[in-house]
């Protein structure tokens, strides 16, 4: 069996610290000689204070027709709130036994989708995953395509 070659750009050691703030300069440091074809954000959108820098950076780093897939808590069912339309933060437990609650950021579906559209993405896939109750989705998974402006 042939040994896989390691991409030195991807294999170099990185130290990440995260405080809920996305720094566009740090994200753009991921830029390489050619644009990326795909980008994935798995269960991070709800942990970020302002997601606009994330979406803008991903858009800039992707090639035309590149794919951005992201998953996040379902804003309609996970964060049952009287303030669905108002972006806000709240604290909750992610994993039983964790030492303290963590901060989450709630956004409505229209806020998330409109940010995609305003950034230049077209949504061509939307999925709702159910884990605990087969009729109440916990997660949304969005597939967005970068359209040349």
Predicted regions and their residues:
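Conserved SAM-binding strand-loop segment of SAM-dependent methyltransferases
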Residues: 15-29
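A short acidic, Gly/Pro-enriched loop at the edge of an enzyme's catalytic core
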Residues: 28-39
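Conserved class I S-adenosyl-L-methionine
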Residues: 67-96
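Short alpha-helix
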Residues: 103-126
């Amino acid at each position: 069996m042939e040994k896989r070659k390691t991409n030195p750009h991807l294999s170099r050691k990185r130290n990440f610290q995260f405080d809920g703030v996305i720094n566009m300069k740090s994200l753009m440091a991921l830029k390489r000689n050619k644009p990326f074809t795909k980008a994935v954000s798995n269960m991070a959108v709800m942990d970020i204070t302002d997601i606009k820098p994330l979406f803008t950076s991903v858009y800039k780093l992707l090639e035309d027709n590149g794919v951005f897939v992201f998953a996040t808590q379902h804003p309609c069912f996970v964060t049952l709130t009287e303030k669905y339309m108002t972006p806000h933060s709240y604290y909750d437990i992610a994993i039983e036994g964790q030492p303290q609650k963590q901060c989450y950021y709630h956004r409505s579906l229209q806020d998330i989708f409109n940010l995609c559209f305003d950034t230049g993405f077209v949504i061509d896939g939307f999925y709702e995953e159910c884990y605990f109750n087969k009729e109440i989705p916990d997660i949304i998974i969005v597939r967005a395509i970068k359209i040349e402006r």
